Regions:
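Short active-site loop at a secondary-structure junction
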Residues: 45, 58-79, 91-99, 117-129, ...
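Conserved catalytic neighborhood of penicillin-recognizing serine enzymes
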Residues: 103-140, 240-259
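Beta-lactamase-like hydrolase cores
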Residues: 5-6, 12-71, 82-91
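Solvent-exposed, polar/charged alpha-helical surfaces in well-ordered, non-transmembrane soluble domains
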Residues: 55, 78, 82, 124-128, ...
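Solvent-exposed coil/turn segments that connect beta secondary-structure elements
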Residues: 51-53, 61-63, 83, 98-102, ...
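Second-shell loop/turn segments in exported
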Residues: 36, 60-68, 110-117, 124-129, ...
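Short, well-structured active-site flanking segments
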Residues: 82-100, 216-225
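Penicillin-recognizing serine hydrolase domain
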Residues: 29, 33-34, 40-41, 147-263
Length: 263
C-alpha cells in the first residue's frame, strides 16, 4: 500500500497527486465533503510526497520560508528517537519533573499539560504528550534531559541534524515552536535570539518527515490514535484528543492516516 506523507503549513486538507492548481485543490476538498474548507483554510505552503520513495507528487510555495510553529516538535522528537536508537535512553527511562518544569506547565499562554514537580514521567509518556497535545513543557523536558539542561546544545543538535538531512532553508531558535521569550525566563538559550521564531519550508519539513518515518517508524504508534491517556490510574492521569482530525476515529478521519505532528 502506497504511503503518502503530506506537509501542509497552515492547514491539512485532502490532496490528490493529479491536482493542477490551488483553486482545484480547494474545489476537490469541498467536493469531498469538507464544506468547512473556506479560503481561511487554504494552505500557504504545500508539499506532498510518496512516503516510500520521497518523490514529490504535489507542491505549491514549497520553498517559502515560514514559521513551522508546533511542527518544530517533530525535529525534537526525531532527535529523541535517534538517542533511543543509540541506547542513550529508552521509552522506559524515567525523568523526574523539576520545579522549573512545573512552572513552564503553568504558563497557559503556550500549549501545555499538567506537569508536577517531583513526579516521575517515562520517556514514552513525554513523547506522547509532546506529539498529541503538543505540550511545550514535555518537549523541553526531553531536550533538557538529553543535554544536561543545555538548551543551546539542543538547538545546535537540531540545526546540525537539519544540515545533515539537507534541510537547506531551516533554522531553529527554540525546541518546541514557541518563541523562547514565551517561557518567561524558564527556557532561555544564550546563543540564540529568544524572540525569533523557527524558520523552515514545506520542502524541508518533508525531508525531515520522510527520514523520520523511514528510520524510526515507531513514532507512528504515538501519533496514530485519536485519544490517548497517560499515567492512567494515578492522581496525574490525563486524557488527550488528537489535534490531527484526519486520524481514523477523529472528526474527519481518513483510513490509512497515521499522523505525525500538526502545526
Amino acid at each position: 500500500k502506497k504511503k503518502i506523507v503530506a506537509v501542509l503549513l497552515a492547514a491539512c486538507l485532502s490532496l490528490a497527486p493529479s491536482l493542477s492548481s490551488a483553486d482545484e485543490l480547494m474545489d476537490i476538498t469541498r467536493a469531498a465533503g469538507y464544506t468547512e474548507a473556506t479560503e481561511a483554510y487554504r494552505p500557504k505552503s504545500t508539499l506532498l510526497i510518496d512516503g516510500n520513495t520521497g518523490d514529490v507528487l504535489w507542491e505549491e510555495n514549497a520553498d517559502e520560508v515560514r514559521d513551522p510553529a508546533s511542527m518544530s516538535k517533530a525535529m525534537t522528537l526525531y532527535l529523541v528517537f535517534e538517542a533511543m536508537s543509540k541506547g542513550e535512553i529508552s521509552e522506559d527511562t524515567v525523568i523526574t519533573a523539576t520545579p522549573t518544569d512545573q512552572a513552564i506547565a503553568d504558563i497557559y499562554e503556550i500549549s501545555n499539560n499538567k506537569i508536577v514537580a517531583g513526579v516521575d514521567y517515562t520517556v514514552s509518556e513525554l513523547i506522547t504528550m509532546t506529539a498529541v497535545p503538543s505540550s511545550n513543557v514535555t518537549t523541553v523536558m526531553l531536550a533538557n534531559y538529553l543535554t544536561n539542561n543545555d538548551p543551546d546544545k539542543w538547538l545546535d543538535m537540531m540545526n546540525e541534524k537539519s544540515k545533515e538531512l539537507g534541510m537547506t532553508n531551516t533554522k531553529w531558535f527554540n525546541a518546541s515552536g514557541a518563541v523562547a521569550v514565551a517561557f518567561k525566563g524558564y527556557y532561555s538559550p544564550q546563543r540564540y535570539d529568544n524572540n525569533q521564531t523557527n524558520q523552515t519550508t514545506a520542502r524541508d519539513l518533508a525531508i525531515m518527515t520522510y527520514n523520520f518515518i523511514k528510520k524510526y517508524p515507531d513514532i507512528l504508534k504515538y501519533t496514530s490514535k485519536p485519544v490517548v491517556t497517560v499515567k492512567k490510574g494515578t492522581p496525574y492521569e490525563e486524557t488527550f484528543e488528537t489535534y490531527n482530525y484526519s486520524i481514523p476515529g477523529a472528526k474527519y478521519g481518513i483510513d490509512g492516516v497515521d499522523g505525525l505532528k500538526t502545526g
